[in-house]
Amino acid sequence: MQSMELKKLLSYTRQAVDDYKLIEEGDHIAVGISGGKDSLTLLYALAGLRRFYPKKFTLTAITVDLGYDSFDLTPIKQLCEELKVPYHIVKTEIARILFHGDRVSDKAVKGSPCALCAKMRKGALNEAALELGCNKVAYAHHMDDVIETAFLSMIFEGRFYAFPPSTHL
């Protein structure tokens, strides 16, 4: 990453952390890693912030493996080693539970399979974070995710809901 881009990323990260009081002294933060650009950028930003932020905190990266065979985690492992962040993989059978071959399971048919998968992933991640001694979990949600969540909530749940900047673990 270019130096100017990195400074801008760290500046935005610090601003959000300060504005919403997301990090306290001694926090052990689990970072949910999907392998996508958003979660990897969050990990990179928090690892950079950790070097100079006045409140000391530690990070642990966690990926919830849904059980797909072709999910290569090698690049994530390498990045975590470079950033000196412990990395844990939570093996699950979420894909098998939601899908039977090409057919969506009865559990997922009652609602959106995406919503059920998200809830199951979040539960697995939160459980792992607690087991690893983390007191907070960082998700790489951004404004597009807030808007999407609000619309999906209205469509599938009949209510207007969007997640807050922080919730308790």
Where are these regions (language model features)?
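ATP-dependent adenylation/nucleotidyltransferase module used to activate substrates
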Residues: 1-165
